[in-house]
């Protein structure tokens, strides 16, 4: 069957979800293909006593170990970076630690400041409204006033430091180093239908409670209500091109 659409998105993770949501009000025919499926809150490891064991099986960060039907093998033997991903609605926002810092203004000028790589073609000020919008959509918690950034106000107050965090802070104070609690996507108050964190379990393998933001519970409900079509269990095997070498469609 040959489907014609206005916008085709491959993958429902962080970028795919945000693009789908941002275009939804245009009323174009938008389809997103996701090779995984929806993950029910009852499926997350933190619902059971065996949650630590499941971090090495069906919720391992490495797809080679996880070996779900929706996964595929990845050879990272010669890579200094080991893959961390998840195949499902929400993509790798399902499986991350909720650590959510913005880039610093200096990160956009590494060539100018440090003589390495290249400067970005845009600067922090240009992207700041989009950072703020994403913070609002994902529900960021943090402490305002960090002098390493231009002024910003996270939507929610920060999570408590905890004993280890406080110890690190004390050590850096003794060394005269600047430190600041990092922004996270962990709800510290009730926010947009999500309850605040109750320390149900480790953040990485998905949050059964929904306190940790993932795009399946933040961007996608809005996008789908606005008319975006999300097709799950659809693995793209080829991107087709036209006579000019431009992408024209997919085979899945």
Residue ranges: model-predicted function:
Residues 1-112, 116, 121-125, 129, ...:
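N-terminal glycine-rich phosphate/pyrophosphate-binding loop and immediately adjacent elements
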Residues 3-4, 25-27, 82-83, 88-90, ...:
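Short, well-ordered loop/turn elements at secondary-structure boundaries
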Residues 17, 36, 90-91, 139, ...:
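Glycine-centered flexibility motif
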Residues 40-42, 189, 240:
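Generic structural signal for helix capping and beta-alpha/helix-loop junctions
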Residues 45-49, 194-198, 245-248:
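Short low-complexity, flexible loop/linker segments enriched in glycine and/or proline
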Residues 56, 71-73, 99-102, 111-236:
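Conserved redox-cofactor binding core of oxidoreductases
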Residues 238-252:
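Conserved beta-strand-loop-beta-strand element in the redox core of flavoprotein oxidoreductases
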């Amino acid at each position: 069957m040959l489907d014609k659409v206005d916008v085709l998105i491959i993958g429902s993770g962080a970028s795919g979800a945000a693009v789908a949501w941002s275009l939804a009000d245009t009323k174009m025919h938008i389809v997103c293909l996701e090779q995984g499926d929806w993950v029910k809150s009852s499926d997350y490891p933190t619902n059971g006593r065996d949650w630590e064991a499941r971090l090495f099986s069906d919720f391992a960060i490495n797809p080679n170990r996880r070996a779900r039907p929706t996964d595929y093998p990845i050879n990272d033997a010669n890579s200094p970076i080991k893959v961390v991903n998840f195949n499902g609605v929400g993509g790798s926002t399902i499986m991350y630690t909720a650590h959510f810092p913005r880039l610093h203004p200096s990160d956009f000028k590494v060539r100018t400041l440090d003589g390495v790589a290249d400067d970005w073609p845009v600067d922090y000020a240009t992207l700041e409204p989009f950072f703020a919008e994403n913070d609002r959509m994902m529900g960021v918690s943090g402490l305002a006033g960090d002098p390493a950034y231009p002024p910003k106000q996270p939507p929610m107050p920060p999570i408590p430091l905890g004993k280890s965090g406080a110890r690190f802070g004390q050590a850096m104070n003794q060394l005269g180093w600047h430190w600041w609690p990092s922004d996270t996507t962990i709800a510290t108050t009730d926010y947009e239908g999500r309850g605040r964190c109750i320390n149900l379990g480790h953040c990485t393998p998905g949050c059964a409670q929904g306190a940790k933001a993932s795009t399946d519970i933040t961007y996608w409900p809005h996008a789908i209500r606005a008319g975006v079509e999300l097709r799950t269990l659809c693995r793209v095997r080829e991107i087709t091109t036209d006579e000019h070498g431009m992408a024209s469609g997919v085979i899945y």
